[in-house]
């Protein structure tokens, strides 16, 4: 199987940082860390990436501007055909630094702002004055011709402020607004209580989808693969070209000591560039191979009709269960196959069955009924009702098999399914390729339906297998 090349590679240039953010994945701080890559090793990393791909190279940290050769490595990456961008808190960007960023070939910086005011932002970032310093840095970058992307980490504390943060980004002259949905990694583990519930994720991403349809900014939620499902549900497949989780398929993360991970929040070591070149790790690591195969996904992610465009957040699955292929723990969507299974196996005989089923699946009665009707319109459900034993109520039944030319199978199947006397209709992979059951008030009526269908469908080869003894088997279609 051919392996795609990475579209983005994030490299943690250092773990030093002048802020103390409560959610920091890297648990970064003022002190340096032993074992960080040297400039020579950084050049070797760039050479390895450039040997087989030309991705966006995200220079991140910590605070990458505290890496003494950050501009040299950015320029080197640019010369190799990569597109360097900078993930910075912007507090260190004065006019001179902004000029150096631009001269190094860095065309965009991403800056994290989490609240629309200094008091709350500074508290979240752990340093007084961080908000105003970041705004000054953004202004200096914009003046130097550098594009600015504003990132906002969304938690319970600011989920109702996403619209305000978007408006702030626009006022600051940003080109893009990327809401980040909290992943419990690094110091972020201590903020798990501030993380959104599955339904809050759903509601927040729905709001962002509507915001994106009206905004002049580029809006892209990050660490939110469910967004690709939501925009398809709200806008349709025609306007959707993106994919959810890119970990291991289009994205990789290189840590400050050379460890390679599927993403920065995905705390699983795929290899180390000091031991093996980056291209080999990308091509051969088992975790990457697993992530490239959606058939390996488990739980409701494995059953989901959106698994190829969403995939669930593998970092959240790993953090919650220890298994990166487990189901996404913060997804409220009920896959079609899960609903179908519940309808077939556990349909309740009560006054309001859809309320009962919805309660079991975590959706409301209206949504459960509408989803069921949608499955019916799409042909996945033929009927919902009691299955009676024809012989017990004086009726007759027979199993019929038609021999249909393969090119006419769909046409004939539709004609057969249109008859209310037909209770089952399915294909089999042999010469008798269309099978169905007919139930009518007596044997003569059954015979008339069979003859009418043969005539209307232009079929001469038919088997009639009338029921002699009934055996009830539990058949569930997935």
Label the model's feature ranges.
Residues 30-32, 117-124, 186-191, 434:
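A short acidic, helix-capping loop that chelates divalent metal ions and anchors anionic groups
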Residues 199-233, 259-312:
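C-terminal accessory region of radical SAM enzymes
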Residues 176-196, 220-234, 269, 468-476:
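Flexible glycine/acidic-rich beta-alpha junction loops that bind and position SAM and/or redox cofactors
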Residues 245-249:
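Short, small/polar residue-rich loop motifs at catalytic or cofactor-binding pockets
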Residues 39-60, 66-184, 196-197:
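Radical SAM/AdoMet-radical enzyme domain recognition
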Residues 336-478:
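A compositional/biophysical signature of low hydrophobicity enriched in polar/charged and small residues
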């Amino acid at each position: 199987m051919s392996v795609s090349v990475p579209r983005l590679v994030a490299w943690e240039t250092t773990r030093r940082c002048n802020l103390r953010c409560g959610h920091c994945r890297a648990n970064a701080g003022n002190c340096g860390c032993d074992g960080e890559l040297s400039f020579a090793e950084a050049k070797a990393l760039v050479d390895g990436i450039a040997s087989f791909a030309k991705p966006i190279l995200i220079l991140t940290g910590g605070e990458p501007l505290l890496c003494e050769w950050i501009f040299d490595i950015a320029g080197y990456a640019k010369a190799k055909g990569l597109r360097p961008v900078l993930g910075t808190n912007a507090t260190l960007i004065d006019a001179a630094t902004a000029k150096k960023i631009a001269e190094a070939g860095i065309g965009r910086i991403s800056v994290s702002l989490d609240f629309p005011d200094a008091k709350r932002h500074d508290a979240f970032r752990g340093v007084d004055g961080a908000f105003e310093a970041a705004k000054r840095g953004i202004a200096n970058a914009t003046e130097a011709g550098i594009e600015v992307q504003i990132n906002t980490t969304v938690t319970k504390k600011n989920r109702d402020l996403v619209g305000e943060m978007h408006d702030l980004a626009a006022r600051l002259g940003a080109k893009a607004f990327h809401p980040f949905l909290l992943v419990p990694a690094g110091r972020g583990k201590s903020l798990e209580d501030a993380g959104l519930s599955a339904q809050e994720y759903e509601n927040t991403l729905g709001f962002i989808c509507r915001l994106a349809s009206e905004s002049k900014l580029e809006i892209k939620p990050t660490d939110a693969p469910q967004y690709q499902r939501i925009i398809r549900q709200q806008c349709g497949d025609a306007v959707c070209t993106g994919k959810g989780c890119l970990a291991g398929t289009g994205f990789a993360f290189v840590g400050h000591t050379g460890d390679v991970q599927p993403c920065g929040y995905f705390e699983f070591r795929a290899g180390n560039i000091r031991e093996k070149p980056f291209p080999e790790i990308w091509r051969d690591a088992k975790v990457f191979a697993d992530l490239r195969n959606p058939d390996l996904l488990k739980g409701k992610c494995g059953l989901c009709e959106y698994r190829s465009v969403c995939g669930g957040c593998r970092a959240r699955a790993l953090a919650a269960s220890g298994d990166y292929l487990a189901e996404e723990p913060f997804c409220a969507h009920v896959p079609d196959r899960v609903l179908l299974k519940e309808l077939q196996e556990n349909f309740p005989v009560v006054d309001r069955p859809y309320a009962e089923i919805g309660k079991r699946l975590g959706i409301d009665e209206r949504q459960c009924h509408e989803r069921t009707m949608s499955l019916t319109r799409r042909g996945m459900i033929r009927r919902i009702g009691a299955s009676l034993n024809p012989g017990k109520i004086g009726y007759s039944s027979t199993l019929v098999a038609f021999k249909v030319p393969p090119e006419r199978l769909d046409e004939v199947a539709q004609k057969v399914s249109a008859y209310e006397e037909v209770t089952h209709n399915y294909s089999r992979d042999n010469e008798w390729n269309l099978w169905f059951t007919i139930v009518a008030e007596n044997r003569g009526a059954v015979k008339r339906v069979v003859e009418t269908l043969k005539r209307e469908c232009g079929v001469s080869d038919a088997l009639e297998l009338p029921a002699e003894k009934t055996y009830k088997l539990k058949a569930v279609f997935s």
